[in-house]
Amino acid sequence: MIVLVGLPGAGKSTLAEALARRLPGARVLDKDKVRHVLFDPCDYTSAERDVVFAAMLDAARYHLGRDRIVVFDGLTFSRRSQVAAAEAVAHDAGAFVAVLVCDVPLEVAIARVEAADDHLAANRDAQVVRRVAAEMEEPSGDYLTLDMTSDPERLVDQAMAYVEELAGE
């Protein structure tokens, strides 16, 4: 399981897609797509968010039980408890967990969010980025921090090396 931690606009989706291309059979679980399937129109409430997160954990449990790698995308994992919930699912399935912290300056995340007018999450704006940044907790346990302003290919190589190390490949 790969858990991408970071602000909206950090580049988690770009990284998730690149990792999935290099990991045969990997499943990207995208929060925004799941939310739109379950709730359209979306109201972006905490209750809705909780249902979506639970559905993603269930989907992860299903795929991990079939020896597939799961990449969580679209979630900020701003709370340690969220990371812990994903880790528990992976551990129950006997799967590895690679926590990748997608680090980007606040100003860069805001600029990216404001420039992206085609994102599925209609609530993404500078205010949301600032709120998530204020709530962000450093994950406990092992993780790899990636500078999401650096070369994209280098980032994917770094992430893959970490994933392969944890997966025992």
Language-model features and meaning:
Residues 1:
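Walker A (P-loop) ATP-phosphate-binding motif of ABC ATPase nucleotide-binding domains
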Residues 4:
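Hydrophobic anchor at the beta1->P-loop junction of P-loop NTPases
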Residues 7:
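P-loop (Walker A) phosphate-binding loop of NTP-binding proteins
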Residues 10-66:
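Conserved substrate/cofactor phosphate-moiety recognition/catalytic segment
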Residues 33-35, 78, 103-108, 151-152:
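Conserved nucleotide-binding/hydrolysis micro-motifs of P-loop NTPases
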Residues 48-97:
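Glycine-rich phosphate-binding loop used to anchor ATP phosphates in small-molecule kinases
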Residues 91-113, 146:
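Conserved phosphate-donor/acceptor-positioning beta-strand/loop module used by diverse small-molecule
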Residues 115-158, 166-169:
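Small-molecule kinase domains that catalyze NTP-dependent phosphoryl transfer to phosphate-bearing small molecules
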